[in-house]
A protein has these predicted regions:
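Conserved beta/loop motifs at nucleotide-recognition and modification sites
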Residues: 1-203
Length: 203
């Protein structure tokens, strides 16, 4: 099951799936999506958290990941397992391990969050990624297009209790808006807090 970032909140409101995969090259959006999943997990009683980071796939202990879901502590009823693969390349052993991991999912006391960078077409068609897709929810974070930035920023300001004058038109001539594919989401997000001249508090 694949969803977009702006669909995540509504999805989480209906309940959690056992596996979430967040991937893409927009650091802020990926972080926010992961934070939203973590918050929903905490609210659902997933009180223990284990994090695995794959530095070198060839030297990573994949058996530790496979065993983690079966190693609940005496004091934690439910646990969140996070797997981070910065390279997006688990290797052959990792590919096999991820597919076995997905096959073993099903326990209500374990929720898994996998974080990946941007993946190319071949990676998205791989056996391990297909297994993640079949076992849970795939969330791809995409760059915000330049033409969409004014509305995107206005929406974020509204979430802070602020709004843009003239329905967002005040942002259109903003010279510091980055181009679509080259910039991350971080600069305009930080700038949201400095646009005091173009916004006003919602009464």
């Amino acid at each position: 099951m694949q969803i977009k970032a702006d669909q995540l909140a509504a999805h989480l409101a209906w309940g959690l799936r056992p596996l979430y995969t967040v991937y893409g090259d927009e650091p802020l959006l990926a972080q926010e999506a992961s934070d939203a999943i973590r918050a929903a997990a905490r609210a659902a009683g997933f009180s223990e958290r284990k994090v695995f980071t794959v530095g070198n796939a060839a030297h990573f202990d994949w058996s530790a990941l496979l065993g983690a879901a079966q190693a609940l502590s005496l004091f934690a009823e439910r646990q969140l397992i996070e797997l981070r693969i910065p390279s997006g390349k688990p290797g052959k052993e990792g590919s096999d391990a991820l597919q076995r991991y997905c096959e073993a999912l099903g326990a209500d006391d374990v929720l898994t969050l996998i974080q990946l960078p941007r993946l190319d077409f071949q990676q998205q068609k791989s056996g391990w990624f297909s297994a993640l897709d079949a076992a849970g929810v795939i969330l791809r974070v995409e760059p915000v297009e330049r033409r969409e930035l004014p509305a995107w920023i206005a929406k974020r300001l509204a979430a802070q209790g602020q709004r843009v004058a003239d329905g967002g038109e005040a942002l259109r001539p903003w010279p510091s808006l980055p181009t679509a594919s080259k910039a991350t989401s971080l600069p305009p997000t930080r700038s949201c807090k400095s646009l005091r001249c173009s916004i006003r508090r919602v009464a």
